[in-house]
């Protein structure tokens, strides 16, 4: 079946995808410090979501690569700005998480 010539054009929106990963080497910290950093991490993500920089974020479960902890879809317009925001996360600053930033495309209007 051939595509219809009156089909709407397929357009993509561009976002920045941040993968949050557990570093291969990280020091042990107390449960209290871990809880404190987690609260600061969540507050950071919440503030970026409220500001509109993050469109969606959340943790992974049952992933094959246990170093992958979660992801966030940003819309800042640049990898550099997204990396700056992601690297200011208190859990990243403390060395508990690392970030991998890349562009992510999805059909226009899906997010």
Residues covered by each model-derived region:
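Conserved, structured core segments of small domains
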Residues: 1-111
């Amino acid at each position: 079946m051939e595509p219809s010539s009156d089909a709407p054009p397929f357009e993509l929106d561009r976002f920045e995808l941040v993968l949050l990963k557990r570093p291969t080497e990280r020091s042990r910290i107390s449960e209290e410090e871990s809880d404190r950093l987690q609260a600061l991490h969540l507050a950071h993500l919440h503030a970026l979501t409220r500001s509109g920089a993050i469109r969606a974020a959340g943790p992974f479960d049952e992933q094959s690569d246990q170093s992958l902890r979660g992801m966030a879809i940003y819309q800042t317009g640049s990898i550099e700005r997204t990396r700056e925001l992601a690297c200011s996360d208190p859990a990243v600053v403390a060395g508990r998480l690392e970030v991998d930033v890349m562009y992510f495309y999805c059909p226009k209007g899906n997010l």
